Amino acid sequence: MDPLGPAKPQWSCRCCLTTLLFQLLVAVCFFSYLRVSRDDPTVYPNGSRFPDSTGTPARSIPLILLWTWPFNKPTALPRCSEMLPGTADCNITADRKVYPQADAVIVHHREVMYNPSAQLPRSPRRQGQRWIWFSMESPSHCWQLKAMDGYFNLTMSYRSDSDIFTPYGWLEPWSGQPAHPPLNLSAKTELVAWAVSGWGPNSARVRYYQSLQAHLKVDVYGRSHKSLPQGTMMETLSRYKFYLAFENSLHPDYITEKLWRNALEAWAVPVVLGPSRSNYERFLPPDAFIHVDDFQSPKDLARYLQELDKDHARYLSYFGWRETLRPRSFSWALAFCKACWKLQEESRYQTRSITAWFT
């Protein structure tokens, strides 16, 4: 009796078939996994296809819209992480199509002040969008400020009490030894210069000049005066010992490129007419400039400048600060990056009265 003998081949075939099916199933699963993994488009914030091992969520990049170019002159948009080390980058654009998505809108006052109701953004603003009022002009040259009230959340200007402080210039310490050559006094062949564009006969600066020039020769450049071809300003002004850094209007902190660029970059001693001496001394050493308020009359100022012209040691004393400090100047790109930094450092949302603050 051998009833099991004929059944062995049938059992072996079933076992082999089962094994083959299992291996086929494993192979299909493996190749399916490879295909999905290869085709998966996910890229994580760390730049790889795999999540950051720290588990830190990605920080969104603020989108900043420049509603207008300042003075309608486009400028190169910076990488703020390079311009302000330690600052994360922002997406900065002048393309108004992004207005509905923008985290912030910078409005330069000069371009919207003529017709605010038509020139300010008119579409509804998204929740949390912050508007930044921006001006480098004094209140005397900013029209229709009341029309700005109730719209803006942050201020950006030359005023030191702005939410975003953007001065026309500042001093910073040298890192190491001063990199500039000593003053070449022999190249200072002329005495006093003044470059002026807006000539208002009744303005404080023109009235003071008219009294001063009765006692002292002043070379005046600009409209209706001596020609100053573009690109020759520094070369021309560097021949002078003194420069009249007279502001077009008198307001706190309104100390403009007339001092920071025209005078200091030309290595001319600035003779200033603007805010008080104490206001200037918030930004400059007291022996870095001459203030008209230090003299009882323009005649006394003229006499003092003539004395300095003959006394080289006293004249050179106005440059002592340059051994430890150097002047730096404003740029639009830097202003935009300061706004970028502020938006990421502070989430405060408020509505300010521009009129109450600025005037």
Curated annotation (Swiss-Prot):
GO terms in the biological process aspect are: fucosylation; glycosphingolipid biosynthetic process; N-glycan fucosylation; protein N-linked glycosylation; protein O-linked glycosylation
Q: Spell out the subcellular localization from the entry.
A: Golgi apparatus, Golgi stack membrane; Golgi apparatus; Secreted
Q: How does it sit in the membrane?
A: Single-pass type II membrane protein
Chain positions carrying an annotated carbohydrate = N46, N91, N153, N184
> What function is annotated for this protein?
Catalyzes the transfer of L-fucose, from a guanosine diphosphate-beta-L-fucose, to the N-acetyl glucosamine (GlcNAc) of a distal alpha2,3 sialylated lactosamine unit of a glycoprotein- or glycolipid-linked sialopolylactosamines chain or of a distal or internal lactosamine unit of a neutral glycoprotein- or glycolipid-linked polylactosamines chain through an alpha-1,3 glycosidic linkage and participates in surface expression of the sialyl Lewis X (sLe(x)), Lewis X (Le(x)) and non sialylated VIM2 determinants.
Please provide the record's keywords in A-Z order. Glycoprotein, Glycosyltransferase, Golgi apparatus, Lipid metabolism, Membrane, Secreted, Signal-anchor, Transferase, Transmembrane, Transmembrane helix
- Lumenal side residue ranges read 35-359
Q: Which organism is it from?
A: Gorilla gorilla gorilla
Could you state a single Gene Ontology molecular function term?
4-galactosyl-N-acetylglucosaminide 3-alpha-L-fucosyltransferase activity
- SUPFAM superfamilies registered for this protein in UniProt: UDP-Glycosyltransferase/glycogen phosphorylase
The protein here is known as 4-galactosyl-N-acetylglucosaminide 3-alpha-L-fucosyltransferase FUT6
Q: How is it modified after translation?
A: N-glycosylated. Proteolytic cleavage releases a secreted glycoform of 43 kDa.
Enzyme group, top EC level?
A: transferase
